[in-house]
Amino acid sequence: MPAKESPFRVNLKILPSAQRNELTGYENGLLKIKIAAQPEKGKANKALVDYLSELLDTPKSEIEICRGLSGRNKVVAFYSLSQADFEAKISAILRGS
């Protein structure tokens, strides 16, 4: 299996048990995301990866939670998405485009 490229990493603040999945913006340098799933047995983590995959049109296999599996603050790596592409997509979503 070929080695993956060096990933782009982003710091997130996750708010589980929300009414719906929603990207809410930046807070203290962290991208804040509401996730509807409960924070038990990895449900919120799986829902986060699913949501990011859908939101950013990136395969789930190319998204990895590197730190914060049991906390709200997480570091997520994207193996097939550049920082520029990530920022452009997030900006467009936050602007409502």
Swiss-Prot record:
Belongs to the UPF0235 family. This is UPF0235 protein DET1292. InterPro entries: DUF167 (IPR003746), YggU-like_sf (IPR036591). Gene3D superfamilies: YggU-like. GO terms for cellular component: cytoplasm. It holds the Pfam family DUF167.
